[in-house]
Amino acid sequence: MGLLRIMMPPKLQLLAVLTFGVLMLFLENQIQNLEESREKLERAIARHEVREIEQRHSMDGSRQEIALDDDEDILIIYNRVPKTASTSFTNIAYDLCAKNKYHVLHINTTKNNPVMSLQDQVRFVKNVSSWREMKPGFYHGHVSFLDFTKFGVKKKPIYINVIRDPIERLVSYYYFLRFGDDYRPGLRRRKQGDKKTFDECVAAGGSDCAPEKLWLQIPFFCGHSSECWNVGSRWALDQAKYNLVNEYFLVGVTEELEDFIMLLEAALPRFFRGATELYRSGKKSHLRKTTEKKAPSKETTAKLQQSDIWKMENEFYEFALEQFQFVRAHAVREKDGELYVLAPNFFYEKIYPKSN
């Protein structure tokens, strides 16, 4: 390259640099176009598959409505928080759906926006509640909590979720935006090319690692109210806690994902029979690993922990962890380092009137 500079006149050197720059921009644009085309094709294929399923079940469009059995009239919604091992868990649901005879559907919102418009909320609630062909159904997507009773629905879905230590989640997301993961290693990420570590970002006061970026798990559980997305809102934290206890069937933590799966299998075998063994086999456990992730320094962690936002997100995480461990303590026992689900420990007696 040095010899080329000596031999080439300055004007030609400038022209070569400009040509190279234009070529790189062109290639990046082509890659982006290909990615958008792939996404459009995936959506078209998904719509085609849905139409085929509906036609298969329609019976000439005049089939009489027959009440579904309780085991069939079930909807699970997993409104997954980004970077909480959600892909690992969701792929277990995909692996089991054919064997356990249920449907899995991804809720694909534009640009992964967790807040739906009011009209989309109505369409979504009406659609999943009346879509008999997709029952029993397991829906998953990066969508904040939605209260179905607000729309006059008689039967609510079963909500589940997983959350993670707030700083660990943010660090994982920071590196994911830059280096991707081993699930789709060839995909170009939004911040690709930015080599700055998380520690360097915090030291420089960068926006991608600011304490405000911690504010995610609380609004996901709080829901679609405007105050939920007001960073640092005490009302949002209280509402998120209320929903976790009253609206969610079970909320696990990433750090104890196997126990979460075990409890789901024990309580909802219609969906999760075989899930624990599948997770333990290693085929899907920790499927998606963020590339080039570096643990933050003690100084970085201490700096983030000074933030009121971290204190609130951590309070919510500790609240969820305590609730999960309470549920687990009453459902399983440990023996020789292994957890075992408790057998049923109630029965009925003194039944009156006596049958003849």
Swiss-Prot record:
SUPFAM superfamilies: P-loop containing nucleoside triphosphate hydrolases. It holds the Pfam family Sulfotransfer_2. The active site is at H140, H142. InterPro entries: Heparan_SO4_2-O-STrfase, P-loop_NTPase, Sulfotransferase. GO terms for molecular function: heparan sulfate 2-sulfotransferase activity. Residues 29-356 are lumenal. Disulfide bonds join C201-C209, C222-C228. It is an enzyme of class 2 (transferase). Residues 1-11 are cytoplasmic. Keywords: Coiled coil, Disulfide bond, Glycoprotein, Golgi apparatus, Membrane, Signal-anchor, Transferase, Transmembrane, Transmembrane helix. Residues 24-51 form a coiled coil. The chain crosses the membrane at residues 12-28. Its main location: Golgi. It is a single-pass type II membrane protein. Belongs to the sulfotransferase 3 family. Catalyzes the transfer of a sulfo group from 3'-phospho-5'-adenylyl sulfate (PAPS) to the 2-OH position of iduronic acid (IdoA) or glucuronic acid (GlcA) within the heparan sulfate (HS) chain and participates in HS biosynthesis. This is Heparan sulfate 2-O-sulfotransferase 1. It comes from Xenopus laevis. The lineage of its organism: Eukaryota, Metazoa, Chordata, Craniata, Vertebrata.
